From Swiss-Prot:
Gene: U76
GO cellular component, one term: host cell nucleus
Pfam families per the UniProt record, alphabetical: Herpes_UL6
Keywords of this entry: Host nucleus, Viral genome packaging, Viral release from host cell, Virion
Keyword rRNA-binding among UniProt keywords: no
Protein name (Swiss-Prot/TrEMBL): Portal protein
Primary location recorded for the protein, binned into one broad class: virion
Intrachain S-S bonds: none
Superkingdom of source: Viruses
Family: Belongs to the herpesviridae portal protein family.
GO biological process: chromosome organization
UniProt subunit comment: Homododecamerizes. Interacts with terminase subunits TRM1 and TRM3.
Amino acid sequence: MLRNQSVGNGVSKQASAKAATFSTINSTLAADDMFKRNFVSYLPLNNEDNDILFPSIKTIKFIEMLHGKKEFFKGQSIHSVLRDSAVFKKQMFYTLSHTLLNSISIQQINAEWQRHLKAFPFRSKGMSFQEYFNIWYYAIKQVILEGILQTINYILQNLDNDIYNKYIDWICTIGITPIVTLPKNKVTLTPLAKSISSRLIQEIIRNKQNFLLHILTQISSTSIADFTNINIYRNKSDGNITCLSNNKELEYFVYSAPYFINNQLLFTTPLAHLYSELNKHENLHRHRKMCQLLNTFPIKVLTTSKNSVDNKKILELIEREEKTSDAKKSLIKFLLNLSDSKSKIGITDSIEGFLQDITPSIIDQNKLLISKGNLQRRGQDNNDRDIRDIFKKQIIKCMEEQIQSQLDEIETLKTANRLFENKIKDMHSLINLSETSKHDFTLDSDIESLSLAKALNKVQSLPFTSVSIDDTRAVANSFFSQYIPDIEYADKKIDQLWETEYTRTFRLRKNVNNQGQEDSISYSNYTLELLLIPFMKHVLKLRHFELLPEEFLFLSLKEIMLAVYSNCKIKHYLRLIYIRQINELSHLIHTQKQSDLTLTPDLGSTNPEDFQYPQDDVASKLKRIRNSRHIQYIKRPEYL
């Protein structure tokens, strides 16, 4: 018993070991196969052999500017017009409705008519054949429109509207669109066929099954990569472009190829054309914000000395400092007194005071300044010459001492100045170095998004230099008020640049009202050709489709369906069946008047204006759109 259990346990262990071994081998083989298929993506990117297209500082800036990371302009909204996913949805709706409605054959219409005749035979009592046929005509029309609409909705519910938005973003920034191919799940039309009761619609779906499955497969398995984890580079030797996403190579579509001139990369997209002007405007905005923060600080005061220094003040300071005077101070006092003297008497008083300060013991005041009565006697006095000699000697002595002391002091100050100038230069260099290292270089990028308090703190820490003004100089100009540069003209210029670049690059149409004012901006027939045809052919890989007419952009989906129905061949088939039945059943309606045999306008005419409601409403709307937009379908120029 125990032996059998041990044997059983050994077998189970061997089986589990084999399973683990097989699992390891399969994982290794799968990894090896994946490595072989994606070998190129594992190789390191050599910048010397490749030119980086994306991501780079410049191309990332393209995307930030496109979606207004820092600022958004009025003219920039034209990009939203271009990336309208409703245009792509209407294009797909028009393609499907046009293909399905025109796939109906006259045999199918006749078979429906025969079934109707068999189920509800015509009887001439109380009803004309024309009324009988009209009832079936509008009934079969309603069946066809509802069945086709249900089929189209089943297809379009798998449509990712964001795929067209990403496509527009790529061609406006880089010019290259990376295409992601998703795993192709099995698609089927069986649920759709089961939900439709009309035999005619089921036949249409069955006849166009390959076409519908191809569209359903492509729109469910095709996507456009976003701007994350994408690397796009160009080989310098052969010029081949490679797109990688998470180490996996992607398909791509080149809408606008970049140029390489003098080893420089030149993009040819709208954002590349606007890049330099947008950079200038961004710098202007940053400068404006700095001025706003610096010149609107709560308190900003310019101070100066309130003391007025004149000759009288100097004399008071000298006398207060030291009452005992020496020769230098007496000489300065004498010179200041002379400068204030405006008459002979003032000069005489200045000389008298100077002599009293210098030689009070040897000067006789009566002899120095005598009255006019004693003038004759003073001229004869021998002591006058002695006084003049003493005065002259004292003046010369004071001036020599002053000049010598000034020269000595000047030399000393020059030496000290040279020493301090060197020290100041060294200190300035150290301060500038430390201030530069402390400066937050991220301030330029986030100054617009910071709160006022944080922005003020950051701006005040910038390495600005204060300037001291000497007493002998005056301020010529300064901003002591709120100085903020005006950017109104620059904003208008950028708005016009956005609109002009997009309008002329993609041939957008500006719609105006009766007063000539701009009403809206929309796709033109040129824009549809420039954007939708490459997208349908190269991205979705749909080769057979009908391009959406420009006037259909202003219709709803139901109106598009009615407009397509009014121009398809079903109407002609119905008219043919009506005339044929009139001839076959002429013996039944021989009692009717000849006017009853006349075709009604909605059956006998092929003009859109002849439709009854709601067809006539759609036709008149299309006519009004063509006239108001001046839409003309002419041959597209070769350069486009």
